[in-house]
Amino acid sequence: MVSRRGSETKAIVCVLTDRIRISNQWVSHLSFAGLLGVAGFVFAQQHGLFRNLNNLKLFSGREKDSGDDSFLVPGLQNLGNNCFLNVILQALASCKDFRSFLQWVLEDARGSLAGEQEEQLPLTFALSALLQELGTVGSRRSVSNPRKVMVTLTDYAKNFNLTSQQDAAEALLHLISSLQEEIVVCYRPSQSSNLSDILFSRNLRMLAPSEGLHGLMELKRWHKHLRGPFDGILGSTLMCRTCSSQISLEFQFFHTLPLSPLLHHGGYNIMSGCTLEHCLKKFLNTEKVENYFCYRCWHGAALKYLSVIGAAETEIEKLRSCGGEDQCDCKTSLHLQRMPWSNSYSHILKQLIIARFPKLLCIQVQRASFNMFEEFKLSGHIAFPLVLNLSLFTPSSIGVNIEERIEMSSEYQKPEASKNHGMYRLVTVVEHFGRTGSGHYTVYRSVRVFSQEEEEEDCDEDLSWFSISDSEVCRVSESDVLGAEASLLFYERL
């Protein structure tokens, strides 16, 4: 079967060959080769493959050494199909909070580790050094080597081949989990405290009994090791709209938010005008849960049923005093098996909530999809902002009060108390070209270009964007970045 794009290319070739046929004689082989080149160029233009053509030096009107355009960040060597890891490393280099986290871990471990940091924390040490190198802005082109990070990462992610094409989002998760494993194993409680005294309660609160002020400080130190800048918390709540009761509330940590785009009818292309906010609403939207048994609704219906049939007051009182939990045996003990009951009595809704925002928000746009024959890639642009406001997705904004149910210490609540805790700034965009399971990754990353005197001012006017494809680096505009068909988006909390 010939693909749709293959058919279009063939059609372009046929049109052009018809126009240059002279006296029923074909043009030379050289001309025909040129013809194929023209056809390929036209095809690429029609499918938007050259939308960033102006970024190439061949088509750029910029002078290499003119003004600030001479400033560049280092590229990364491709050591064999590891572009998926290179874009993650470049992305992390633009995440100030992540670099600071690694530096804090190394500084905190300096006094407690018996050996050298490079031996005890090899991945943390290698990654921190590489990210510092990638954050250096210079006037000359330079290329860094990710080999040390790859070697140390392989020791933790043994089943993840770093020299064959992989998914960039999966590489990020392997890197984060490997760092956590290394940091937690090398953690040493200070003085006489014991890790066994630090307990985890069911509501995710960590407790340090009988430790006093020292125990609280140790708890904060352990908590800082445990939670990285990518750690957020998702809440999942089940609510019955019939009886207005909250059936369950569960929490789980997340490192990335997997968002599905809005699709055209048929599900092969992303809907025109789709935005990141649309994807977030879809992810957090309420959904009806079928075939779910609401015990509170059932007990209410059972009370009415017993009253109608004239049951004994003792049975009614027993039913009324029942808590309606999962271990309830009212149905058998009160002979209510014959009571008419169906899910029509209950209207159960499931709602996801971002209960705690991470310092660094990584959004994964799920472009891989399946039909009954094959896996394919969802093409199309999703509009994303330079500044993202997540305050619209807090529990209070959607009418669900969960604050009273999350008993966490005030130290954990402080980051959420800020009125700007839901505001994020875009720092990196990862883009994938080609089909699922193959192709090539590139990255757009933001860098602040300033002098030493201006470093503390942290002005948005000094923010520059670079397009990076392994070792190739060029400066681009914000419009180029916003036009990317993003696979991963990295946002930093303001």
Swiss-Prot record:
It comes from Arabidopsis thaliana. Keywords: Hydrolase, Membrane, Protease, Thiol protease, Transmembrane, Transmembrane helix, Ubl conjugation pathway. Its EC number is 3.4.19.12. Belongs to the peptidase C19 family. The active site is at C83 (nucleophile), H440 (proton acceptor). GO terms for molecular function: cysteine-type deubiquitinase activity. It is an enzyme of class 3 (hydrolase). Pfam families: UCH (PF00443). GO terms for biological process: protein deubiquitination; proteolysis. It is a single-pass membrane protein. SUPFAM superfamilies: Cysteine proteinases. GO terms for cellular component: membrane. It catalyses: Thiol-dependent hydrolysis of ester, thioester, amide, peptide and isopeptide bonds formed by the C-terminal Gly of ubiquitin (a 76-residue protein attached to proteins as an intracellular targeting signal). The chain crosses the membrane at residues 30-50. This is Ubiquitin carboxyl-terminal hydrolase 27. It is found in: Membrane. Recognizes and hydrolyzes the peptide bond at the C-terminal Gly of ubiquitin. Involved in the processing of poly-ubiquitin precursors as well as that of ubiquitinated proteins. Residues 74-494 form the USP domain. It comes from the Eukaryota. The gene is UBP27. The lineage of its organism: Eukaryota, Viridiplantae, Streptophyta, Embryophyta, Tracheophyta.
